[in-house]
């Protein structure tokens, strides 16, 4: 996808963006049988939780801010069954091309969009980071957290974050999360 296509050619903000995904419909095991994955359940925040955050953000002196995690899934390593992938020729390192390799595979180390377990690993990684920053889980709602000192309520829906609370604390909350 071309971003900022309205800008003149050569402009620093005009660029093409894409995403490499794990195409789960072509996964086979070492015996060439279709692979079966054990589902690692992820549970993003609900619509009710989002509305509760909106309500909290509407209190006097409060606000709401949203942000996306950058390249969320690739922030965490893939665990479990060792997985190998074929890279498109355009992504091959020069050494593979020079050796005239045929159909090489390499281990998949980072979670990728499309892998059945990526969502669960991202959620585990994200929650562990959030908890180290002083946020506490809200037991009744998965992917919902409260920071008692800053009085911030945060929900996470996959890689989208919504933070609500006192206006003067919102930026401090984001700064904590980005450490």
Predicted regions located by residue number:
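Nucleic-acid-interacting cores, centered on viral/eukaryotic replication and modification enzymes
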Residues: 1-179
């Amino acid at each position: 996808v071309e971003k900022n296509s309205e800008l003149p050619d050569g402009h620093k903000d005009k660029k093409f963006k894409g995403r490499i995904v794990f195409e789960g419909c072509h996964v086979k095991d070492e015996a060439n049988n279709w692979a079966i994955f054990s589902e690692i359940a992820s549970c993003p925040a609900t619509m009710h939780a989002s509305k509760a955050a909106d309500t909290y953000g509407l209190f006097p002196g409060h606000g709401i801010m949203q942000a996306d995690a950058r390249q969320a899934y690739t922030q965490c390593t893939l665990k479990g069954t060792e997985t190998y992938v074929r890279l498109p020729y355009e992504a091959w390192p020069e050494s593979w091309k020079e050796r005239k390799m045929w159909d090489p595979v390499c281990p998949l180390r980072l979670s990728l969009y499309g892998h059945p377990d990526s969502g669960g690993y991202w959620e585990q990684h994200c929650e562990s980071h959030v908890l180290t920053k002083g946020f506490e889980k809200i037991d009744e709602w998965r992917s919902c957290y409260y920071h008692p000192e800053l009085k911030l309520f945060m929900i996470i829906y996959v890689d989208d974050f919504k933070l609500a609370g006192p206006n003067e604390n919102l930026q401090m909350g984001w700064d904590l999360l980005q450490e």
